[in-house]
C-alpha cells in the first residue's frame, strides 16, 4: 500500500541510485521500472544499516510472502538485476514485485499491478535479512 512507511538503508539507497543512473544511460526500455523504483525510494524512511528493524525487507533479504487471493506461500530473495534468477527464487529489484516489496515489514500487505489486475501479498516472515545477520555490505 503506497501510504505505508517503508524503510530503506542508506547503503541500499546509494547502490540503488547508482544502479538507476547506470540503467538510465543504457536501457531505455526499463524507464517505467526505474521510475517506479525511484518513486519508492523517494517515499522511504532512510535508516542506517545498523539500525534497520530486523523485520524489514532490505536488498538481499529472503522473505516468505502469502498471496492474499490464492493463499499460496512464496519465498523470494530480493536482489540486484545482475543476480536475478527465477529458478532460484531470486527476484530483481526492477521487477514489479521486487520494487513493490522493498522496505516493507513482516505483517505488512503490499500490492502491484499485473496484466490482469492487481496482486496483493502479505509479508509472512523474513528468513534472512543481511543487516540482522551482521552482513552490512551485501
Regions found by a protein language model. Give the residues of each.
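N-terminal intrinsically disordered, low-complexity, charge/repeat-rich segments that act as generic
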Residues: 1-53
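Non-DNA-binding regulatory cores of transcription-related proteins
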Residues: 62, 72-118
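Residues that recognize and position ribonucleotide moieties
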Residues: 6, 56, 119
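Short, solvent-exposed secondary-structure boundary/capping segments
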Residues: 87-90, 131-138
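Conserved hydrophobic positions within beta-strands
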Residues: 123-126
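Surface-exposed strand-loop junctions at beta-sheet edges and helix termini
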Residues: 104, 128-129
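Residue-level marker of positions within ordered structural domains that often coincide
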Residues: 21, 68, 128
Amino acid at each position: 500500500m503506497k501510504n505505508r512507511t517503508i524503510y530503506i538503508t542508506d547503503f541500499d539507497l546509494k547502490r540503488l541510485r547508482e544502479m538507476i543512473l547506470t540503467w538510465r544511460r543504457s536501457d531505455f526500455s526499463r524507464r517505467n521500472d526505474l521510475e517506479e523504483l525511484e518513486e519508492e525510494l523517494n517515499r522511504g524512511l532512510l535508516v542506517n544499516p545498523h539500525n534497520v528493524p530486523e523485520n524489514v525487507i532490505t536488498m538481499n533479504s529472503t522473505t516468505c510472502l502469502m498471496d492474499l487471493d490464492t493463499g499460496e506461500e512464496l519465498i523470494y530473495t530480493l536482489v540486484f538485476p545482475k543476480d536475478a534468477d527465477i529458478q532460484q527464487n531470486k527476484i530483481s529489484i526492477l521487477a514489479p514485485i521486487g520494487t513493490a516489496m522493498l522496505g516493507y515489514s513482516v505483517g505488512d500487505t503490499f500490492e502491484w499491478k499485473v496484466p490482469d489486475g492487481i496482486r496483493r501479498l502479505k509479508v509472512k516472515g523474513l528468513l534472512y535479512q543481511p543487516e540482522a545477520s551482521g552482513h552490512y555490505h551485501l
